[in-house]
Amino acid sequence: MVWFPKINSDPDYHYDGIVSALKSAAEHLPRVDAVGVSSAGVYIDNRTMNASLFLQVPKDQFDAKVKDIYIRAITDTFGNVPYEVVNDGDVSALAGAMSLEDNNVLGIAMGTSEAVGYVDEEGKITGWLNELAFVPVDAAPTAMEDEWSGDIGCGVKYFSQDSVIKLAPRAGIELEESLSPAEKLKVVQGLMEQDDPRAAQIYESIGVYLAHTLVHYYNLYHYRHVLLLGRVMSGKGGDLLLDTCKKVLADEYPTVNEKIHLALPDEKFRRVGQSVAAASLPEIKE
């Protein structure tokens, strides 16, 4: 399904998009016993407290229709089933721990935004606000401004499809303005699959960004593993991004490099690993 949350101000549009996604997923299942949701933003008791997905929605409409949007969508679609709504970064980290079968994992999903979460040494989600998408990683005065936080140089502009789109013209790739951000990403990914050197430059640049940023993240979390997820990491581009990142870490930060392990899951898990982890969250009572 196609859903453009960041450019739509109508909360009913968002509700309809979420319901459509739920129904689409249900069509592939024999039944729905529970629903787990992975979504960008801050969620408390399954309620949307703050989320860049809905940045265009006016405050009064946000309070009236967005705070309980997932609760309404789930109960209206499936009735009284257990459900859990969790920040997508935390779910990324949980997916990482499940994939690696180990703890102390920083999960980073690069898609519409940058989702970062952390699973501690005991294998638990901490409940911290790991919204690193809005933590500055570039102090240059000319760095891009994030339209939601108002800050410059935020991670979201370096570790998401926004970064690919931003770098495309600098690499000599002109993308049609009529395309959606996700469609623009697909164009670059298609070129990468054809071993286009212009597309390769984009992923190499993001790999360099990531190496320097992971050291900053390490000073905060002291993680042991990093698992990279999301559609930006799909295909040959993701492999090149990871290889570049590892080379920069080894060359410029050997001490940190010896302490951490970077990994990519298999292609399927890169795309849907968060969904699998989210589905494990609700408690089903016998």
Where does each model-flagged region fall?
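A mobile "lid/hinge" subdomain adjacent to the ATP/sugar-phosphate binding pocket shared
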Residues: 3, 9, 39-44, 151-208, ...
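Internal alpha/beta domain cores that form substrate/cofactor-binding pockets in large enzymes
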Residues: 201-221, 231-286
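Glycine-rich phosphate-binding loop of actin/hexokinase-like ATP-binding domains
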Residues: 1, 59-60, 94, 99-162, ...
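Phosphate-binding glycine-rich/basic clefts of nucleotide- and phosphate-handling proteins
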Residues: 15-20, 24, 30-32, 121, ...
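Stable alpha-helical structural segments in soluble proteins, enriched in small hydrophobic residues
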Residues: 21, 25-29, 93-96, 274-282
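Glycine-rich phosphate-binding loop and adjoining helix at the ATP-binding site
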Residues: 2-19, 31-105, 140, 237-252
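Active-site metal-binding loops of divalent metal-dependent hydrolases
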Residues: 89, 112, 232
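Phosphate/pyrophosphate-binding loops at sites that engage ATP/ADP/AMP, CoA/4′-phosphopantetheine
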Residues: 17-35, 214-226
